C-alpha cells in the first residue's frame, strides 16, 4: 500500500520540485518586496509551478523562473523575445497585496516549440493569505498563517506548516500535507494523498489513489474511490470510505466510521470514542477493542469469531452478535457481507 501511494505522489511532487529546484540557470528576474509588508499573494501562471514560503530568514521577494516548455534552458535574450511576442508577465503590489501574473497573449493555440514554462517562487511574511492558480505545474506552500486557496490542473500539491483556512485541489497529481492545522480541505482527481502531523477539521478526497493518514488529531473525513486507506495514531473522529481497496487502521483513539466495498477492514482501537462503525462488502472485518470499556455490540457476517467471550450478555450466534460487553455503553457495529467478523478484546 505505501509503495503504491508513493508512486502516485511522485508525479505531483516532481512537478512541485520544478518550482522549488532553485536552479539559478532558469532564474529570469527577482523583484524585492522588502518595503511592502505583504499580507496577501495572488499568482496565476500556465505550464509552470508556484511556491509561496513564509520561511523565517528569507528576504521578501518574487523570483521568476523561465524555461522552454520542453525543459530546455534559454538565454535571457531569447526569453525576452518570446515574452514580448507571446506573453504578459506582470508583478505588481497594491496596498499589501502582491500579484504575479503570467499569461499568453493569444487566445488560440500557438506553436508549443516557442512556448514557455513560467514558474514563481515568492517569499512573504508568515502572516499571509494566498490565491494561487496554475494550469499544469505543481504548487508548494510552507510556513504560512491565513486563508490559503490554491488549485492546479495537472501537478501536485505539497503543503507544510500552514495554519488557517486551507483549500486546495488538483486534477491529476498527488497531495502531501504535513504539520498543518485549523481547517483543511484538499482534493485530487487522480493521485494519492498523504497527511501527517495535522490537526483540526480535515477533509481529504481522491478519485483514483490511496490515502495515508498518520498522527492526526481532530475531525477527519477521508474518501477515495480507487485505492486503499492506511491510518495510524488518530485522535478525535475519523470518517473514511473507499470503493476500491482495503482499510487498515492502527492505534486509533477516536470515534470511527469506516466503509469499504473492495477489500478487507482492520481496526485496532486503543480507545473507542462515541461510536465505532465498520463495514466491508468484499472481505473480513477484524477488530481489536480495549477490554476496559463497555460496548453495545452489533456484529454481522458470514461468520463471527470467536464463538463466545467473557463479560458478554446477549445473543451470540454463528453469523450474528447482539448484546452488551462489560455492561454495555458505546455502540459498536460491524458488518462483513462478503466475509467474517473477527473481534478481540485486549
Show the residue positions of the predicted features.
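Intrinsically disordered, low-complexity terminal regions
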Residues: 1-346
Amino acid at each position: 500500500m505505501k509503495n503504491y501511494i508513493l508512486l502516485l505522489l511522485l508525479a505531483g511532487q516532481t512537478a512541485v520540485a520544478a518550482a522549488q529546484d532553485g536552479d539559478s540557470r532558469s532564474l529570469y528576474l527577482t523583484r524585492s518586496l522588502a518595503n511592502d509588508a505583504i499580507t496577501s499573494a495572488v499568482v496565476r501562471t500556465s505550464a509552470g509551478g508556484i511556491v509561496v514560503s513564509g520561511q523565517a530568514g528569507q528576504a521578501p521577494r518574487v523570483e521568476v523562473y523561465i524555461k522552454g516548455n520542453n525543459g530546455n534552458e534559454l538565454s535571457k535574450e531569447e526569453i525576452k523575445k518570446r515574452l514580448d511576442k507571446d506573453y504578459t508577465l506582470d508583478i505588481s503590489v497594491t496596498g499589501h497585496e502582491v500579484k504575479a501574473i503570467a499569461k499568453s497573449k493569444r487566445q488560440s493555440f500557438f506553436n508549443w516549440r516557442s512556448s514557455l514554462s513560467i514558474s514563481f517562487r515568492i517569499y512573504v511574511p508568515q502572516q499571509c493569505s494566498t490565491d494561487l492558480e496554475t494550469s499544469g505545474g505543481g504548487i508548494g506552500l510552507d510556513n504560512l498563517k491565513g486563508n490559503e486557496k490554491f488549485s492546479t490542473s495537472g501537478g501536485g500539491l505539497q503543503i507544510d506548516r500552514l495554519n488557517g483556512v486551507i483549500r486546495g485541489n488538483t486534477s491529476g497529481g498527488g497531495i502531501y500535507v504535513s504539520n498543518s492545522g485549523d481547517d483543511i480541505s484538499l482534493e485530487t482527481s487522480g493521485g494519492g494523498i498523504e497527511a501527517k502531523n495535522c490537526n483540526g477539521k480535515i477533509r481529504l478526497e481522491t478519485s483514483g489513489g490511496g490515502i495515508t493518514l498518520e498522527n492526526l488529531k481532530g475531525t477527519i473525513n477521508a474518501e477515495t474511490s480507487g485505492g486503499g486507506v492506511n491510518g495510524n495514531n488518530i485522535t478525535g473522529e475519523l470518517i473514511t470510505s473507499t470503493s476500491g481497496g482495503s482499510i487498515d487502521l492502527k492505534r486509533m483513539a477516536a470515534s470511527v466510521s469506516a466503509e469499504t466495498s473492495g477489500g478487507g477492514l482492520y481496526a485496532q482501537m486503543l480507545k473507542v470514542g462515541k461510536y465505532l462503525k465498520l463495514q466491508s462488502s468484499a472481505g473480513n472485518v477484524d477488530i481489536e477493542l480495549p477490554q476496559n470499556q463497555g460496548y453495545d455490540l452489533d456484529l454481522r457476517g458470514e461468520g463471527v469469531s470467536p464463538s463466545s467471550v467473557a463479560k458478554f450478555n446477549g445473543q451470540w450466534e454463528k453469523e450474528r452478535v447482539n448484546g452488551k460487553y462489560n455492561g454495555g455503553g458505546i455502540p459498536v457495529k460491524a458488518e462483513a457481507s462478503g466475509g467474517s467478523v473477527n473481534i478481540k478484546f485486549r
